[in-house]
A protein has these predicted regions:
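N-terminal leader/linker segments that initiate helical-solenoid repeat arrays
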Residues: 2, 6, 13, 17-83, ...
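Residue-level recognition of tetratricopeptide repeat
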Residues: 34, 76, 83, 130, ...
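Short coil turns that delineate tetratricopeptide repeat
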Residues: 57, 106, 153, 186-187, ...
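TPR alpha-solenoid repeat register
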Residues: 62, 110-111, 117, 158, ...
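Canonical tetratricopeptide repeat
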Residues: 65-69, 73, 80, 113, ...
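Terminal, low-structured helical/coil segments at or just beyond the last alpha-helical repeat
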Residues: 201-213, 217, 263-266, 270-311
């Protein structure tokens, strides 16, 4: 019995010595990892603290404090690695590291790292999309902004950038939808200008193709977003070619209403005078010929018409 007790004592002493040696190894490994962290060698630091954690966990209660330290440091190292990737414009790698940081932080209870990483992820995705747009890689930028909006449909600023990217890829319908989404989410002022411009360009192209009714419809659509003198003038031109004088008169009058001091205001007033004269509306013809009478180019003709109308 005495021999058995002595044997057990030897085993316990040996285990104690081994535990002390393991703890010393864990501490030494953690110290080396910390030195690497100070030197910003994050990969070496991460590997070191992971090894120290495993060693400390094997030491039971003696290693509890070091276990806590390692679990506190490891998520922050991964977060630092992510931030380093982001600084180097390695956006995909940065996002992957941030997601890894969240995973580890959830396992180790590092709430501050979780909050920081979750805040950074959408910012990094936007940085990537913006960088692609700046580099004029519009197709890739569009894909990046689509992914952002899929996660946050209320992100009007990203919807606006998506619309601009799609415009540059020639996806007009996609751009229109994105501009509409941007307008509905805080970017109305910028989005409606772009929408108005899209339809105005359509109107110009349709007018050149002699698709007159379609050109008028595009002008009217443009004016639904932002009223413009150019849209009214194009619509008036199309209506004149269609010999729809009533519509032409309406569009020209709106043109002058929006841009009364336009360089061609005199010419438009003279045109209106002539259109009203053709419509046998003497009073309105006189009104607009009078407005045109001071015009350098059309003034003389306007005065002649006024004299004829007043007879």
């Amino acid at each position: 019995m005495k021999k058995l007790v002595l044997t057990l004592a030897a085993v316990i002493l040996s285990a104690g010595l081994m535990s002390a040696q393991d703890m010393a190894k864990a501490t030494e490994t953690a110290q080396s990892a910390n030195d690497a962290l100070v030197a910003k060698d994050y990969a070496k630091a991460l590997a070191g603290f992971k090894e120290a954690l495993t060693l400390a966990e094997a030491c039971g209660d003696e290693g509890a404090e070091l276990v806590g330290t390692c679990k506190s440091v490891i998520p922050n190292i991964v977060l630092s690695m992510a931030k380093n990737d982001i600084k180097e414009a390695k956006y995909d790698e940065g996002v992957a590291q941030l997601e890894e940081a969240i995973k580890i932080a959830e396992q180790y209870g590092a709430a501050d790292v979780i909050d920081d990483a979750k805040t950074l992820i959408p910012q990094v995705k936007k940085s990537k999309a913006t960088a692609l747009f700046t580099a004029k890689d519009y197709a890739a930028a569009a894909d990046a902004f689509k992914a952002i909006i899929a996660e946050d449909p209320a992100d009007g600023a990203s919807a606006l950038r998506l619309a601009m990217a799609l415009t540059n890829t020639g996806d007009k319908e996609g751009a229109i939808a994105a501009f509409e989404q941007a307008a509905a989410n805080g970017q109305e002022a910028n989005a409606v200008k772009q929408l108005a411009n899209i339809y105005l360009k359509d109107a110009q192209a349709l007018l050149k193709e002699n698709k007159l009714k379609e050109a008028i419809a595009a002008c009217e659509k443009s004016n639904e977003y932002v009223e413009s003198a150019n849209a009214y003038k194009l619509a008036a031109s199309a209506a004149t070619k269609l010999k729809d004088n009533a519509k032409a008169i309406g569009f020209y009058e709106k043109y002058l209403g929006v841009s009364p001091d336009a360089k061609d205001a005199g010419a438009i007033a003279f045109t209106l005078g002539a259109l009203y004269q053709q419509a046998s509306n003497k009073a309105k013809a006189i009104e607009f010929y009078t407005k045109a009478s001071a015009d350098a180019q059309y003034g003389a003709q306007a005065k002649q018409q006024l004299e004829a109308l007043k007879k």
